[in-house]
C-alpha cells in the first residue's frame, strides 16, 4: 500500500462480521498472498493489545441485571393467576403448560436483551462483555445464564420441565433448582458425547455418497437453469445465493444486455441486479449439470477458497460432505453452559398504534369465536381482515393476516400499544413443531361425569375411549370407594347408609352363616300365583333369603316372580311394577296386562298411612270422554276419609271421597277441542251420523246431537249419542238439567226400559225459546266387587301382619261426581284406582316409630335377578331419648361383637372415638367393568359442604306465610341430578318431626357425654321444573364442612366481587369455584348442588377438568376413577428445543429421507396431477421424462431449504452448492414401474435418471418410471463401484453379489483407488485421465434434437416452468415431497 495516500480513520468497533467483510474486500483488491501478510499484522497487533490490557476474569465481573427482580415477580404473578384459572376449570392442563412456558421464556428473553445495553451503560470494559460480545468465547445465551436467569430446562427426553430456574449461576441455585439444573446439565453432557459421535458418523456417510464427485469438465453444455428472484427472498440470502454462481442465460435491461450466459457473478454484478430490480435470474447449479458421475466447472461456479472458477480435478464432493458434517461436530462440542436449556418461540403480536375505537367487519364468514393457545376467548380470522382504529385526528388502517386471533371486540376502545391480535406462531419462526400426547391424571378418587355429549372413537368402538366434539368440563365427583371382592353381590344398595368398615363384616357374615336356621325368622313362598306348595322352592333362593333375613327388625317381602322369566318385574330407579294377571285374564288373554306399581319416595321414607302401592284394575278403564255419576243426585252415601296428595315421592292423605257403594255410572260422550280459527262444518243442536266431517281434518266417531260452545281456549264441540224425545203434555219429566235414571226405575213394559236396561241419563235441550226436547243418553254401569282379593295380587306373606304392620286396601274414584272427563290422544282413562296403604299400630315395639324406611333390594342368583321390598320401622331418637343409642336399632349390618351403624350418624355410640365424618356415608353402587364385583362408593360428609345461611328477613317471612296459607305444601325432598347421589343421609335425615324440619348438625361431640344442639332449617320452595329461586343475593355465606365446626365469613370481605343479580340454583347443577351465588361471596369450592334449603345449599365437592374438542376421554359416565387414573388425553403441537443437538437429528432425518411428522401430501398430489396432464399432452416418452424432472426439481429445492433452515437457525452459514451436491446424489435415481414393461430394465429396478432418458431415446420406446428418493445410506450402497460399497457397509454381501453378477468396477472414484492402491483421479492425478468418450461424438443428431425439444418445452413455455420452480426456491415452504422409507 502507498504511504502517501490519505487514509480514512473510522472509529468503530470491529467484530467478527466486519473482519469477514474486510478480508473478502482485501482478497478482491490485493489477492491471496498480500491479504495473508496484512492479516498476520492484524493478529500481531491484537496479541500486543491484549497483553497490554491484561484483562482478567473474576466473579465480581458478573453483574446482575437490575430489572430482574420485578420481571421475575411479574412472571410469578402471571403463573399464580394461571394456576387459579386452571383450578377453577377455565383453562386445561396443556393451555396452562403452554402459557407457563411462554411467560417464563419471554421473561428470560427480555433479560437476555437487557444484558447488552446494561453492560454498555454501566461497565463497557467489563471483561465478560468484551469476551462474549466480541465473539471470542461464549455467546449471549451463555453469559445470560451467568448474569440473567438459567430459565427453563429440558429433561433427557427433550421435554420441558415447567418449573423454571429463576436464579443465575452468579447468585447460586437453590436445592430444587440445582436438581432441575442437573437434569439439563446431564442432558448437555450426554448430548456432547453422543451427538459428537453422531455428527462424525453423519460426516462419514455424506463423504461416502459424494466421494467420486470431481470437476472433470469445463462445460457440460446444459441449457437449463434455476430461477432466482430478488423479490422472493431477503437481500442477504439473495446475495449469498448468487455470488460465485454462473449465469445460465443472458440478462437484459430493456434491449441492453448487462450479463451474458456462462458469466460468473461477483459482488458488483449482484449489486447491479439489486439496483435494477431484475426479473428472475436463471443460474446454473449442480442440479442442472448433465454429467452423470462428475460435475463441470460452470455448473459448480467459483471455488470458495480463492474466489475464481473451480479448477479441473478438484474433489468438490468430499469438500461438500465435510462442509455439512463439520459444523455439527463443532456445535455439539460448543455447548458450554447451555446444555439442556430449553428455547422455544413466542407468538408475534399486533399492537394498536394509538388510542381510539377499533372497528372491523364482524362477519361470520370472516371471524368466528375461538380459544387462543392459552385458553383466552378470541376471534379467529379465516382470511385477511382489515381493521380501522379511529383516534381523534387520524385513522389507522391495519391488516390482520389469516389464522390470527383477534383479542378485542368490535367498537371497543383500545389504548396505544395494546395487543389487539396474535399472529399464529410458526409462520415466521424456524422452530420445529411436533405433535405430543399429554395425559391428564386424576388427583383424587371419585365418580366421573361430563357436561356434554361424547361419541366413540371409531377405532375404540367397544371400549371406554370417547372423543369430545366441543369444549366442555369433565367432573370428578368426590367420594370414597370400597370394592366388594368377597362375594358377587352385596347387601348394600344405592342410598343405603353404612360404615365403611362394615364391608369387612359383610364378608364375615356371608362366610359364617350359622347352620342353626330355625332361629332365623324366615319364610319363603311360591314364586307364582297358582297354588303350589310352599316346599316347592329353589334352594338358591332360600339361601339368599336367609342372608337377608338375618338383619333384625326388618320386613322383607319377596317380589312376584312369574314362571316365565320374560315377565320379570320391571325395575326403575324408585319404582317397581309387578305384572298381575287374574285367572280370567289368563283364559281369555283379551284384557291387556296391568300391574301393581310400588313407588318409593326419593328418600325412601313412609309416614303413617302413606300409600305403598297402587293397582289399576283394567275393568275400570275407558277410552272415551264422559261424566261419572254416583247414583242419582242426592241418593248416594259418601263417607269422608283421609285422602291423598302426591308430592315429590311422599304420598299422604288429605280429605277426599272413598266409595262405600257397589256401583257407579259413566255417561260417554265425544268431545273435540278445536282452535278458534278452525272452520266448523256442522250446526249447533244438529243431528249427525257416524264418520261425519265436522271440521277440516276431523271426523266424528259416533252419531248423535252436536253441541257447539265457545270457550277461552277455543271451540268445544260435543257429540251426545242417544235418542231425542219430544215431550207431550202427558209426560211428567222433571225440568232439571240432567237426571240419572238407574236401571229398573222406569216402566217395566215400555220400549224405553227394555232399550236402556243399564239406565239412562235424561238431559233437556232448549235450542230456541219456544221449542225444547229431551235427550236420552246411554249409561255404562260399573259394579265394584266386595273388596279385592289380596291373595290374587300379592303372595300370602304380604297380607299377613308383621310387627304390627298392616296393609289396607282402599278403592278410590279418581274423578268427582258429575265432573267431565276428557281423553288425551287415545289414551285410556282409569276411573277407579286401588291404593295399598301402609300402617302400623302403636304397639310396644313400634311405640316411637314415626316413619318407615323402604327400599328395594336386588339379589342375583344363578343368572336370575330377584327384587325384594324391604321396610324398616324407624325409631325417632328425639321422641324417645332413652333409646337414642340403642344398639338394637335398625341398621344395615349389626352383631353383638362389632360396633353398630345407626341410621343417623350423629347419634353414634359414645365408645366410637373416630369422628363421624370418617365413619359414615351414603353408599352408591356404581358401574364397574367387572360386572361380577360391583364397586361401591361411599359419599360421606367430608365430600360435601354446605353454603349458607343466606339471611334476609323479608324473603323468609314471605315463604313462612305461604306455608301457613296452604298447609298441604310439604317440604319437598331433594331430587337427585342425572342419576347421581340423591340424598346424603348426614344432612337429609330419615326423621320427620311434627314441624317437618330436620336435624342438621351436632354442635358438640364428647366421648364421655354426648350433647346435641339442633338447628331447625327450612327448604326452598321449588317449582315444577326443579329450579329454585334464590331470594336474597346479598347475604353472607357460611361454609360448613361438617367436621363439627363452623366457618364464618366477615360481612364486608367481598364487597364488590359480585354484581347484584338473582342467582337461580337448580339441583344437580355443577358450580365452578369462584362463581357467584351471593353478592358478597363467591363459591368457595367447585361441586354439584345436592340439597337446596331456604338459607343454604349443600354441594358435593368435585374437581373440574376442562377439555377441548378432539380430546380423548377415558372411562364411562358414572364410572369410579381412582387416584392416578387417566382422565383425558390431549393431542397438541409443541416446539422442539432449538439446540443444534436437537437440530442434527433433523438434518439426518432429511438426508436419510425418513418420514417426518410435518411432511404434507400437497406436493405429492401436485406432482401426480403434473404427471397426468403432461403425459396426456405430450404422449408417453416425454410425459414420464418431464414428470420425473419436475418431481425431482421440486424435491431437491425443498430438501435444500429444510437443511439450510436447521443450520441458519443456529447461525451457521453453509453455501447452498455444498448441500446441492449431496441432494443431487440422493435424488438422481428413478424407479422403473411395473405398468410399462421394458425389455431393458426389471420392474422396481433403480436406475439413474440420465440413463433412463438415454435408453429411452436409443430404443425409441417408452420406459415407465417415477422419481424416487434414496437416503444417504442407501445411496452409498447403490453406486457404480462395488469396492466403494463394500468398504462402507455389508462387505460380505456386497462382494458376494458382485462376484455372482460379474460386476466390473471402473475405479472412477477416490475410495476405490485408495483401496487398491492406485493413483487418485484428483488434482495432479487427474491430468492423466482421458475424459473424452467416442460414444458422445457418435450421436450428435439425437443429442441436438433432444436438447432442442427440451429447450422448446421448458424455456419457450417459461411462465409455466418458472411459476412452478422459482416459487419454491430458497423460501421456506412447509410442504415437502413424498418420501420413501428405507424399509
From Swiss-Prot:
Binds 1 Zn(2+) ion per subunit. GO terms for cellular component: chloroplast; DNA-directed RNA polymerase complex; mitochondrion. Keywords: Chloroplast, DNA-directed RNA polymerase, Metal-binding, Nucleotidyltransferase, Plastid, Transcription, Transferase, Zinc. One of its GO terms (molecular function) is DNA-directed RNA polymerase activity. InterPro entries: DNA-dir_RpoC2_beta_pp, RNA_pol_beta''_euk, RNA_pol_Rpb1_3_sf, RNA_pol_Rpb1_4, RNA_pol_Rpb1_5, Rpb1_funnel_sf. GO terms for biological process: DNA-templated transcription. It catalyses: RNA(n) + a ribonucleoside 5'-triphosphate = RNA(n+1) + diphosphate. Signal peptide: none annotated. It is found in: Plastid, Chloroplast. Zn(2+) binds at residues 220, 289, 296, 299. Its EC number is 2.7.7.6. It comes from the Eukaryota. Its main location: plastid. DNA-dependent RNA polymerase catalyzes the transcription of DNA into RNA using the four ribonucleoside triphosphates as substrates. Belongs to the RNA polymerase beta' chain family. RpoC2 subfamily. In plastids the minimal PEP RNA polymerase catalytic core is composed of four subunits: alpha, beta, beta', and beta''. When a (nuclear-encoded) sigma factor is associated with the core the holoenzyme is formed, which can initiate transcription. This is DNA-directed RNA polymerase subunit beta''. It comes from Oenothera argillicola.
Amino acid at each position: 500500500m502507498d504511504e502517501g495516500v490519505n487514509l480514512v480513520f473510522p472509529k468503530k468497533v470491529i467484530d467478527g462480521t466486519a473482519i469477514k467483510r474486510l478480508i473478502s474486500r482485501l482478497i478482491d483488491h490485493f489477492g491471496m498472498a498480500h491479504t495473508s501478510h496484512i492479516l498476520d499484522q492484524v493478529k500481531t497487533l491484537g496479541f500486543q493489545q491484549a497483553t497490554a490490557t491484561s484483562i482478567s476474569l473474576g466473579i465480581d465481573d458478573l453483574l446482575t441485571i437490575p430489572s430482574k427482580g420485578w420481571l421475575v415477580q411479574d412472571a410469578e404473578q402471571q403463573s399464580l393467576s394461571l394456576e387459579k384459572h386452571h383450578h377453577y376449570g377455565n383453562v386445561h392442563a396443556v393451555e396452562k403448560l403452554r402459557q407457563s412456558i411462554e411467560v417464563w421464556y419471554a421473561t428470560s428473553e427480555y433479560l437476555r436483551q437487557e444484558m447488552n445495553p446494561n453492560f454498555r451503560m454501566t461497565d463497557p470494559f467489563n471483561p465478560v462483555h468484551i469476551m462474549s460480545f466480541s465473539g471470542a468465547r461464549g455467546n449471549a445465551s451463555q453469559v445470560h445464564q451467568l448474569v440473567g436467569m438459567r430459565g427453563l430446562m429440558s429433561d433427557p427426553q427433550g421435554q420441558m420441565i415447567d418449573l423454571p430456574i429463576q436464579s443465575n449461576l452468579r447468585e447460586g441455585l437453590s436445592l430444587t433448582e440445582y436438581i432441575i439444573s442437573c437434569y439439563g446439565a446431564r442432558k448437555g453432557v450426554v448430548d456432547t458425547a453422543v451427538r459428537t459421535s453422531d455428527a462424525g458418523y453423519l460426516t462419514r456417510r455424506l463423504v461416502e455418497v459424494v466421494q467420486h464427485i470431481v470437476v472433470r469438465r469445463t462445460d457440460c453444455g446444459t441449457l437449463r437453469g434455476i430461477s432466482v428472484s430478488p423479490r422472493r427472498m431477503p437481500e442477504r440470502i439473495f446475495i449469498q445465493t448468487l455470488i460465485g454462481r454462473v449465469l445460465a442465460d443472458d440478462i437484459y435491461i430493456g434491449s441492453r444486455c448487462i450479463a451474458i450466459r456462462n458469466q460468473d457473478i461477483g459482488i458488483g454484478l449482484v449489486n447491479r441486479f439489486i439496483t435494477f430490480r431484475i426479473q428472475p435470474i436463471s443460474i446454473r447449479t449442480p442440479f442442472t449439470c448433465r454429467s452423470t458421475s462428475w460435475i463441470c466447472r460452470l455448473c459448480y461456479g467459483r471455488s470458495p477458497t480463492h474466489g475464481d472458477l473451480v479448477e479441473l480435478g478438484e474433489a468438490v464432493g468430499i469438500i461438500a460432505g465435510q462442509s455439512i458434517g463439520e459444523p455439527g461436530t463443532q456445535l455439539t462440542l460448543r455447548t458450554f453452559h447451555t446444555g439442556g436449556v430449553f428455547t422455544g418461540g413466542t407468538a408475534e403480536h399486533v399492537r394498536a398504534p394509538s388510542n381510539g375505537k377499533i372497528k372491523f367487519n364482524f362477519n361470520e364468514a370472516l371471524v368466528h369465536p375461538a380459544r387462543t393457545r392459552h385458553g383466552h376467548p378470541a376471534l379467529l380470522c379465516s382470511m385477511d381482515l382489515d381493521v380501522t382504529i379511529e383516534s381523534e385526528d387520524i385513522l389507522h388502517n391495519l391488516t390482520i393476516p389469516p389464522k390470527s386471533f383477534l383479542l378485542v371486540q368490535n367498537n371497543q376502545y383500545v389504548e396505544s400499544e395494546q395487543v389487539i391480535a396474535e399472529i399464529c406462531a410458526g409462520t415466521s419462526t424456524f422452530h420445529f413443531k411436533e405433535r405430543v400426547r399429554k395425559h391428564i391424571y386424576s388427583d383424587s378418587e371419585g365418580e366421573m361425569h361430563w357436561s356434554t355429549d361424547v361419541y366413540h372413537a371409531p377405532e375404540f368402538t367397544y371400549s371406554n375411549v370417547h372423543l369430545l366434539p366441543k369444549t366442555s368440563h369433565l367432573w370428578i365427583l368426590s367420594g370414597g370407594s370400597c370394592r366388594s371382592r368377597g362375594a358377587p353381590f352385596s347387601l348394600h344398595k344405592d342410598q343405603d347408609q353404612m360404615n365403611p368398615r362394615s364391608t369387612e363384616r359383610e364378608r364375615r357374615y356371608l362366610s359364617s352363616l350359622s347352620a342353626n336356621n330355625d332361629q332365623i325368622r324366615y319364610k319363603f313362598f311360591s314364586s307364582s300365583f297358582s297354588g303350589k306348595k310352599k316346599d316347592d322352592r329353589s334352594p338358591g333362593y332360600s339361601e339368599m333369603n336367609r342372608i337377608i333375613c338375618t338383619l333384625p327388625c326388618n320386613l322383607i317381602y319377596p317380589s312376584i316372580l312369574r314362571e316365565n322369566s320374560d315377565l320379570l318385574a320391571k325395575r326403575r330407579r324408585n319404582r317397581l311394577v309387578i305384572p298381575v294377571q287374574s285367572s280370567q285374564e289368563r283364559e281369555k288373554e283379551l284384557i291387556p296386562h296391568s300391574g301393581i306399581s310400588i313407588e318409593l319416595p326419593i328418600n325412601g321414607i313412609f309416614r303413617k298411612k302413606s300409600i305403598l302401592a297402587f293397582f289399576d284394575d283394567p275393568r275400570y278403564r275407558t277410552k272415551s270422554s264422559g261424566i261419572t255419576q254416583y247414583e242419582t243426585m242426592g241418593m248416594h252415601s259418601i263417607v269422608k276419609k283421609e285422602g291423598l296428595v302426591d308430592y315429590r315421592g311422599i304420598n299422604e292423605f288429605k280429605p277426599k271421597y272413598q266409595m262405600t257403594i257397589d256401583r257407579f255410572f259413566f255417561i260417554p260422550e265425544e268431545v273435540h277441542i278445536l282452535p278458534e280459527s278452525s272452520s266448523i262444518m256442522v250446526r249447533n243442536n244438529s243431528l249427525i251420523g257416524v264418520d261425519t266431517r265436522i271440521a277440516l281434518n276431523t271426523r266424528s266417531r259416533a252419531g248423535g246431537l252436536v253441541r257447539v260452545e265457545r270457550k277461552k281456549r277455543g271451540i268445544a264441540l260435543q257429540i251426545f249419542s242417544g235418542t231425542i224425545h219430544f215431550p207431550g203434555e202427558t209426560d211428567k219429566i222433571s225440568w232439571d238439567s240432567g237426571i240419572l235414571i238407574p236401571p229398573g226405575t222406569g216402566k217395566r213394559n215400555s220400549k224405553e226400559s227394555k232399550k236402556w236396561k243399564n239406565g239412562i241419563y235424561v238431559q233437556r235441550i232448549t235450542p230456541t225459546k219456544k221449542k225444547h226436547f229431551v235427550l236420552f243418553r246411554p249409561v255404562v254401569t260399573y259394579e265394584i266387587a266386595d273388596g279385592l282379593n289380596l291373595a290374587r295380587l300379592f303372595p300370602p306373606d304380604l297380607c299377613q301382619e308383621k310387627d304390627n304392620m298392616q296393609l289396607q286396601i282402599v278403592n278410590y274414584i279418581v274423578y268427582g261426581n258429575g265432573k267431565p272427563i276428557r281423553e288425551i290422544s287415545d289414551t285410556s282413562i282409569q276411573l277407579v284406582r286401588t291404593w295399598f296403604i301402609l300402617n302400623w299400630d302403636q304397639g310396644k315395639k313400634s311405640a316411637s316409630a314415626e316413619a318407615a324406611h323402604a327400599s328395594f333390594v336386588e339379589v342375583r342368583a344363578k343368572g336370575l335377578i330377584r327384587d325384594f321390598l324391604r321396610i324398616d320401622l324407624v325409631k325417632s331418637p328425639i321422641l324417645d331419648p332413652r333409646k337414642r343409642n340403642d344398639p338394637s336399632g335398625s341398621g344395615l349390618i349389626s352383631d353383638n361383637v362389632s360396633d353398630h351403624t345407626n341410621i343417623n350418624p350423629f347419634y353414634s355410640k359414645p365408645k366410637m372415638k373416630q369422628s363421624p365424618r370418617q365413619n359414615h356415608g351414603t353408599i352408591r353402587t356404581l358401574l364397574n367393568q367387572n360386572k361380577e364385583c360391583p364397586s361401591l362408593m361411599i359419599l360421606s360428609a367430608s365430600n360435601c359442604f354446605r353454603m349458607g345461611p343466606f339471611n334476609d328477613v323479608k324473603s323468609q317471612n314471605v315463604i313462612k306465610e305461604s306455608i301457613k296459607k296452604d298447609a298441604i305444601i310439604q317440604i319437598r325432598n331433594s331430587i337427585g341430578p342425572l342419576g347421581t347421589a340423591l340424598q346424603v343421609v348426614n344432612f337429609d335425615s330419615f326423621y320427620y318431626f311434627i314441624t317437618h324440619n330436620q336435624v342438621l348438625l351436632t354442635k358438640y361431640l364428647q366421648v364421655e357425654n354426648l350433647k346435641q344442639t339442633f338447628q331447625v332449617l327450612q327448604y326452598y320452595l321449588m317449582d315444577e321444573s326443579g329450579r329454585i329461586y334464590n331470594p336474597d343475593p346479598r347475604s353472607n355465606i357460611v361454609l360448613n364442612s361438617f367436621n363439627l365446626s363452623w366457618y364464618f365469613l366477615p360481612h364486608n370481605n367481598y364487597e364488590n366481587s359480585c354484581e347484584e343479580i338473582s342467582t337461580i340454583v337448580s339441583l344437580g347443577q355443577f358450580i365452578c369455584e369462584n362463581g357467584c351465588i351471593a353478592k358478597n361471596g363467591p363459591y368457595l369450592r367447585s361441586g354439584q348442588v345436592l340439597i337446596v334449603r331456604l338459607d343454604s345449599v349443600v354441594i358435593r365437592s368435585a374437581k373440574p377438568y376442562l377439555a377441548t374438542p378432539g380430546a380423548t376421554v377415558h372411562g364411562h359416565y358414572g364410572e369410579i376413577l381412582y387416584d392416578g387414573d387417566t382422565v383425558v388425553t390431549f393431542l397438541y403441537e409443541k416446539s422442539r428445543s432449538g439446540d443444534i443437538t436437537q437440530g442434527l437429528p433433523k438434518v439426518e432425518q432429511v438426508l436419510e429421507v425418513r418420514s417426518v411428522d410435518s411432511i404434507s401430501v400437497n406436493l405429492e398430489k401436485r406432482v401426480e396431477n403434473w404427471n397426468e396432464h403432461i403425459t396426456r399432452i405430450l404422449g408417453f416418452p416425454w410425459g414420464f421424462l418431464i414428470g420425473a424432472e419436475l418431481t425431482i426439481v421440486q424435491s431437491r429445492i425443498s430438501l435444500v431449504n429444510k437443511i439450510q433452515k436447521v443450520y441458519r437457525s443456529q447461525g451457521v452459514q453453509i453455501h447452498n452448492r455444498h448441500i446441492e451436491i449431496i441432494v443431487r446424489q440422493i435424488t438422481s435415481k428413478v424407479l422403473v414401474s411395473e405398468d410399462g414393461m421394458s425389455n431393458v430394465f426389471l420392474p422396481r429396478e433403480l436406475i439413474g435418471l440420465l440413463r433412463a432418458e438415454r435408453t429411452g431415446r436409443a430404443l425409441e420406446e417408452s420406459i415407465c418410471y417415477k422419481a424416487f428418493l434414496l437416503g444417504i445410506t442407501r445411496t452409498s450402497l447403490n453406486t457404480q463401484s462395488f469396492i466403494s460399497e463394500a468398504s462402507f457397509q455389508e462387505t460380505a454381501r456386497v462382494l458376494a453379489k458382485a462376484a455372482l453378477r460379474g460386476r466390473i468396477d471402473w475405479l472412477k472414484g477416490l475410495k476405490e483407488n485408495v483401496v487398491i492402491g492406485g493413483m487418485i483421479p484428483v488434482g495432479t492425478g487427474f491430468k492423466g485421465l482421458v475424459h473424452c468418450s467416442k460414444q458422445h461424438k457418435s450421436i450428435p443428431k439425437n443429442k441436438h434434437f433432444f436438447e432442442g425439444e427440451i429447450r422448446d418445452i421448458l424455456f419457450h413455455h417459461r411462465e409455466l416452468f418458472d411459476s412452478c420452480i422459482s416459487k419454491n426456491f430458497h423460501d421456506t415452504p412447509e410442504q415437502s415431497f413424498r418420501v420413501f422409507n428405507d424399509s
